[in-house]
Amino acid sequence: MLPLTQAAWALSAREAGLIQSAFHLGYLISLFMVGFIADHFGAKRAYLTTGIAACASPWAFVLLADGFWSAFWLHALTGLCQGGTYTPALALINDHVERARRGRAMGYLIAGSSAGYAICLGVAGLALKFTDWRGALAAVAMLPVTSWLLGIYVLRSTANTVHPRPAGESLLASIPAVWRNRRGMLSIWGYSFHNWELLGLWAWLPAFLTAALLAHGENPQSAATLALWFAALSYVANIAGSIVGGTMADRWGRTQTILTWSCVSLALSFSIGWLISLPLALLVALACLYNFAGIADSSTHSTVLAESVPPHYLGVAYAIRSVVGFGAGVVSPVVFGWALDLAGEGAGWGIAWSTLGLGAALGPIVTWKLHRGAR
């Protein structure tokens, strides 16, 4: 959808990146707040309550966005409301799934998120055949309601657990406790470098595929529609990547899994932008591999953090991770767009994608320290 709104509102690549980042900014604020809520009121209650806002918020963007500033703030509002279910879902898994199966369970959660993202892109691509970009977004905005109702059904017999804190300890005392937890903080930093790459990838892949289609002679409307379909196909690879990564983490180790897949995705960050002129089938295949590798270690980062801190401040640990990790995800799409604007045609895409690799390159180093500390 980005190329169509970019053309409709005459946005630069930097402005388009800022709108993408606005969602992540709202999302990280939401994750920070809901981490405390989940610790205080219980993960199930937090999940179902914040889901109401997640159902309502997309409609504000659909009905009111009409230019850079309105799109920026309304997309931030959407992110603010959408983030409320993520941390409680992680906490629910930690509460109700045994350690030996926790990595795979986290993988299925991330796979479900990826499936939802792929379905959204597929629905948007189909809707664009019959309506404009605003109508397509309206079709997508109907999907969170289905998810929320499904959540009510699935969690109907699940207990709402509130972990007791030590006597006299306030909820805010958990913040310095997390900062002093070396293993927990290494996990948070590793996740942050991972997010720099992954959220930049998700923000810019449809636009990149649109540019590739335009270079192959497609008209703008057709290119945007096909790019959404191709991007949706590549996000289906996220589903497999999440499950494979989570299963590997249970069988062969948490940090080994993170190291393996972070190195594969780094190689693709530094190469895919220079390969825009490849045959489309091969380029889409690389995009699928990129998404597979980029998310294969995501659930494992969440599992490592859950196993590194006491359960009574796990929500706060996820909240701190949200500020640091999604803060990186706010910045990376902007840096990508800035690099694309500066470099222009030709080498622009190669340089822009390489900014994701540069930001993520510290991830394997942090994970190696985490691995050595666990031995």
Residue ranges of each PLM-predicted region?
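Residue-level signature of mid-helix packing/kink "hotspots" within the transmembrane helices
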Residues: 24-32, 117-118, 235-243, 330
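Conserved MFS/SLC helix-loop-helix module at the cytosolic interface between two early adjacent transmembrane helices
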Residues: 29-66
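Structural signature of the two symmetry-related core transmembrane helices
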Residues: 45-59, 256-271
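Cytoplasmic helix-loop-helix junction between adjacent transmembrane helices
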Residues: 74-112
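Helix-loop-helix hairpin linking two adjacent transmembrane segments in secondary transporters
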Residues: 109-155
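Multi-pass alpha-helical transporter architecture, strongest
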Residues: 149-154, 354-375
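Flexible cytoplasmic inter-helical loops of multi-pass small-molecule transporters
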Residues: 152-176
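Extracytoplasmic gate region of multi-pass secondary transporters
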Residues: 184-235, 239
